[in-house]
């Protein structure tokens, strides 16, 4: 679309421009903003459904609150494209999630309107509460607002923050963006019911004592399902959130500016913790996304007039798909197997497993700590848990990994998806640290398959062990080596030599084996596929060290404490002095961009490996 398609939006350079518009103009602006988001994401790829669902809420927040003086903290942050567009970044949207371009998440270094960096869920209430308390301590009269989804609200961290906020009595507004409930007809019925309730004697009595009691509604009951179920439609003297010390308001239609703006204006004048429940619809305004918000959660480039289409040529099998197929095959063979995921069914490749084995599939919600200890409890009883989790999210359950699984030496398999660089999602989602943080834990092992075939084999190896094992693999596809049928594993803790050369030996951990092999051809170097960061194949290492002048370790993970460090430790323990060049991800957070380009910038493609090795050890002999 041309800029002429968005005449009002083109006049908005910062939120102050919204505050000069009439209500009718704001509605027109919201329509343009939604169309702009759709047009933009269709050209760059990115998160779509969630952003289409927050258009009116974003317009209302920036209209009512004095941003950036008033702080907005967006939980997870993948719903912030409208926020970015309205805060001076409209013309940079073509660079979204590209190297050097806009982040797909809030980023403090990108804009003063991004008050807190988010990407992992359920952090917003804690951060906003901290900001509210800091404002109080400094004598500043400003508001802090946390916008959190119904999924993120299920995490324990969110409830910990609510508990603290109620006691602190801070000037904090928590907005529950509930997009798990249809707007029509339920909200129409709710609005009628609430209109009757608010005009009745019960509401008047509640108001006299300073309480706003709007009664339980289905999303609230769903959110509080761990608490005693209450009869639908029953008016309670206090909601769950009021028990936490909040004044609960809602639910209201999150797509209706005539409801949102007056409600937010009223709340702005209230002191103490406030809780506003808004109901939105993922994909709002784009029928294809409304019908299938999961498919349009994070699409690539597409034609909005056609929608998502299957590629002309079938894509290569991804590591996620390899895992999903292995999980189903192993479950068919062993009825002790159960699959556990913290709300990542699609992303972790467990859709088919849920269909085929519904009684053995456990989605515990956004609750990584619980997921790990839940698996530990099952393992205690002879069940064989497989926890499918992104590498970056396992960080959230580190104490449980150590205390509840490893300390008790329980046989839990951790399928670590998105290991290494993830590309467009950037530093917040990179799985850079799993090798260092897993290999230092007693009883834990970690495997690094080089390709799709090895991924299936090493998952079987991990499953056969009587102690906890993690198998790390990257996003997307690898070298394209088709997995073998059957469930045979590879030897535990053993690597292999893939190329025999002279003078220099390259020890590759994981999918960087293939650029290492290319570099090995150029340098006439020996190349080993080490497969395991722990236990390290010490026998193979010492054999290689004895026959070469220098060693190079290569891994798509943090160099500090990584597999290269394990090699150096093993050589030192054996009393062997040999120069070792450790190549991997440096001690910096690597931003978003094309994964292949990012690896090349870190010198982890074949050409980069040759450059680094030559710079350290000189050119290949002869």
From Swiss-Prot:
Q: List, separated by semicolons, the cofactors it needs.
A: Mg(2+); thiamine diphosphate
Does the entry feature the keyword Magnesium, yes or no?
yes
Q: Record's SUPFAM superfamilies? A: Thiamin diphosphate-binding fold (THDP-binding), TK C-terminal domain-like
Cofactor notes: Binds 1 Mg(2+) ion per subunit. Binds 1 thiamine pyrophosphate per subunit.
Q: Which CDD domains match?
A: TPP_DXS (cd02007), TPP_PYR_DXS_TK_like (cd07033)
Which residues are listed for thiamine diphosphate binding in this entry? 78, 119-121, 151-152, 179, 286, 368
Catalytic reaction list: D-glyceraldehyde 3-phosphate + pyruvate + H(+) = 1-deoxy-D-xylulose 5-phosphate + CO2
| Enzyme Commission (EC) number | 2.2.1.7
- Which Gene Ontology BP annotations are present? 1-deoxy-D-xylulose 5-phosphate biosynthetic process; isopentenyl diphosphate biosynthetic process, methylerythritol 4-phosphate pathway; terpenoid biosynthetic process; thiamine biosynthetic process
Question: Could you state a single Gene Ontology molecular function term?
Answer: thiamine pyrophosphate binding
Q: Which Pfam families match?
A: DXP_synthase_N, Transket_pyr, Transketolase_C
Any one Gene Ontology cellular component term annotated for this protein: cytosol
The UniProt record gives the binding positions of Mg(2+) as 150, 179
Keywords carried by this UniProt record = Isoprene biosynthesis, Magnesium, Metal-binding, Thiamine biosynthesis, Thiamine pyrophosphate, Transferase
Among Gene3D superfamilies, the record links this protein to: 3.40.50.920, 3.40.50.970
* InterPro entries for the chain: Dxylulose-5-P_synthase, THDP-binding, Transketo_C/PFOR_II, Transketolase-like_Pyr-bd, Transketolase_BS, Transketolase_C, Transketolase_CS
Q: In which pathway does it act?
A: Metabolic intermediate biosynthesis; 1-deoxy-D-xylulose 5-phosphate biosynthesis; 1-deoxy-D-xylulose 5-phosphate from D-glyceraldehyde 3-phosphate and pyruvate: step 1/1
Report the enzyme's class at the first EC level. Answer: transferase
Give the family per the record: Belongs to the transketolase family. DXPS subfamily.
What is the annotated role of this protein in its UniProt record?
A: Catalyzes the acyloin condensation reaction between C atoms 2 and 3 of pyruvate and glyceraldehyde 3-phosphate to yield 1-deoxy-D-xylulose-5-phosphate (DXP).
Query: How does this protein assemble?
Result: Homodimer.
State the protein's name.
Answer: 1-deoxy-D-xylulose-5-phosphate synthase
Q: Which organism is it from?
A: Paracidovorax citrulli (strain AAC00-1)
Question: Which lineage is the organism of this entry classified under, starting from the top rank?
Answer: Bacteria, Pseudomonadati, Pseudomonadota, Betaproteobacteria, Burkholderiales
């Amino acid at each position: 679309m041309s800029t002429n398609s968005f005449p009002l939006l083109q006049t908005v350079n910062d939120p102050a421009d919204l505050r000069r518009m009439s209500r009718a103009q704001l509605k027109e602006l919201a329509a343009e903003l939604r169309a702009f988001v759709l047009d933009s994401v269709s050209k760059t790829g990115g998160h779509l459904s969630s952003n289409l669902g927050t258009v009116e809420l974003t317009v209302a927040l920036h209209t009512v609150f004095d941003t950036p003086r008033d702080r907005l903290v967006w939980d997870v942050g993948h719903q912030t494209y409208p926020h970015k567009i309205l805060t001076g970044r409209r013309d940079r949207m073509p660079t979204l999630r590209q190297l050097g371009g806009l982040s797909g998440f809030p980023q403090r270094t990108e804009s003063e309107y991004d008050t807190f960096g988010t990407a992992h869920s359920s952090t917003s209430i804690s951060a906003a509460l901290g900001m509210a308390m800091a404002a109080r301590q400094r004598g500043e009269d400003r508001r802090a607002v946390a916008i959190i989804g119904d999924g993120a609200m299920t995490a324990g961290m969110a409830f910990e923050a609510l508990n603290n906020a109620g006691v602190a009595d801070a000037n904090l507004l928590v907005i529950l963006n509930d997009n798990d409930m249809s707007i029509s007809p339920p909200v129409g019925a709710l609005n009628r019911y609430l209109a009757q309730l608010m005009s009745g004697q019960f509401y008047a009595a509640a108001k006299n004592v300073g309480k706003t009691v709007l009664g339980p509604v289905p999303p609230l009951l769903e959110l509080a399902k761990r608490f005693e179920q209450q009869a639908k439609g029953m008016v309670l003297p206090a909601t769950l959130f009021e028990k936490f010390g909040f004044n609960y308001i809602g639910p209201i239609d999150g797509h209706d500016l005539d409801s949102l703006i007056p409600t937010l204006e009223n709340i702005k004048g209230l002191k103490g913790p406030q809780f506003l429940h808004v109901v939105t619809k993922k994909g709002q305004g784009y029928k294809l996304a409304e019908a299938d918000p999961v498919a349009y959660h994070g699409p690539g480039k597409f034609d909005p007039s056609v929608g998502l289409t299957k590629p002309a040529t079938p894509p290569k099998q991804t590591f996620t798909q390899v895992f999903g197929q292995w999980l189903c095959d192993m479950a068919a063979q062993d009825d002790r197997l159960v699959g556990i995921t913290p709300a990542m069914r699609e992303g972790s490749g467990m859709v088919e497993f849920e269909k085929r084995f519904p009684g053995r599939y456990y989605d515990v919600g956004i609750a990584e700590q619980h997921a790990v200890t839940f698996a530990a409890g099952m393992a205690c009883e002879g069940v064989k848990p497989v926890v499918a989790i992104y590498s970056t999210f396992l960080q959230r359950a580190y104490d449980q990994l150590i205390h509840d699984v490893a300390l008790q030496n329980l046989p839990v398999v951790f399928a670590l998806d998105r290991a290494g660089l993830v590309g467009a999602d950037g530093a917040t989602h990179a799985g850079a640290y799993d090798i260092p943080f897993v290999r230092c834990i007693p009883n834990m092992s970690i495997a690094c398959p080089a390709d799709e075939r090895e991924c299936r084999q090493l998952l079987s190896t991990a499953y056969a062990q009587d102690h906890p094992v993690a198998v790390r693999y990257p996003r997307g596809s690898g070298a394209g080596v088709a997995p073998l049928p059957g469930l045979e594993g590879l030897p535990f803790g053993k690597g292999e030599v893939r190329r025999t050369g002279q003078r220099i030996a390259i020890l590759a951990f994981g999918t960087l084996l293939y650029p290492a092999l290319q570099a090995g051809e150029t340098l006439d170097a020996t190349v080993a596929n080490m497969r395991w960061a722990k236990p390290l194949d010490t026998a193979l290492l010492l054999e290689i060290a004895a026959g070469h002048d220098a060693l190079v370790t290569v891994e798509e993970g943090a160099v500090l404490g990584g597999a290269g460090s394990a090699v150096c430790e093993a050589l030192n323990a054996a009393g062997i002095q040999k120069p070792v060049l450790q190549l991997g991800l440096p001690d910096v957070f690597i931003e978003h961009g094309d994964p292949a380009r990012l690896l090349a910038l870190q010198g982890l493609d074949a050409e980069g490996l040759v450059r680094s090795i030559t710079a350290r050890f000189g050119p290949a002999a002869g």
